[in-house]
């Protein structure tokens, strides 16, 4: 009797972001990105954003995502190329993003022969109920923001169930708050 076991050498639960023409995006242009939160967000929401960033920083062993203590006052702002990295909250009703919980808008440019991210904005859709405690009355900010931070670093959605970068979530979900081995 012969038994052969086959194990994959590595398993990752992510896909690399691509441009509209299919070119790979090779992560951040700079070694880190500093972002500002909107001053209309609660302190608990800013903490949730910070904790989401720490998940990725801890995984990479570097401070890739730096949450500035300075806040911005620009509400109702869709992602735009203005050389700033802003997190804001607004209604997305009437836009092509109306069904999205959050929208991450990366700007990538060609540097030499590689596309790299030079700027990223995130909009929290205020048309959905948000919570910071895992309550089933709303979507958990840290849960969704950890996923969006992956996009900020150049990752795309995956088909791997229970990976942080899988598309979609439910009210009260908190399992995407932390990264797993495959992320």
How does the language model describe each region?
Residues 1-6:
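Bacterial N-terminal signal peptides
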Residues 9-183:
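Zinc-dependent metalloendopeptidases
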């Amino acid at each position: 009797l012969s038994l052969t076991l086959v194990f994959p050498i590595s398993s990752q639960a992510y896909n690399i972001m691509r441009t509209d023409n299919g070119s790979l995006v090779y992560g951040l242009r700079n070694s880190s990105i500093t972002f500002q939160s909107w001053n209309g967000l609660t302190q608990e929401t800013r903490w949730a954003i910070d904790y989401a960033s720490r998940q990725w920083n801890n995984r990479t062993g570097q401070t890739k995502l730096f949450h500035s203590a300075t806040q911005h006052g620009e509400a109702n702002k869709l992602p735009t190329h203005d050389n700033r990295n802003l997190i804001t909250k607004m209604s997305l009703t009437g836009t092509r993003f109306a069904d999205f919980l959050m929208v991450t808008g990366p700007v990538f440019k060609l540097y030499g022969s590689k596309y790299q991210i030079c700027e990223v904005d995130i909009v929290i859709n205020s048309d959905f109920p948000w919570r910071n405690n895992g309550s089933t009355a709303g979507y958990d900010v840290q849960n969704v923001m950890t996923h969006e931070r992956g996009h900020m670093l150049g990752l795309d959605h995956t088909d791997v169930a229970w990976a942080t970068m899988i598309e979609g979530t439910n009210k009260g979900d908190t399992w995407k708050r932390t990264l797993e081995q495959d992320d």
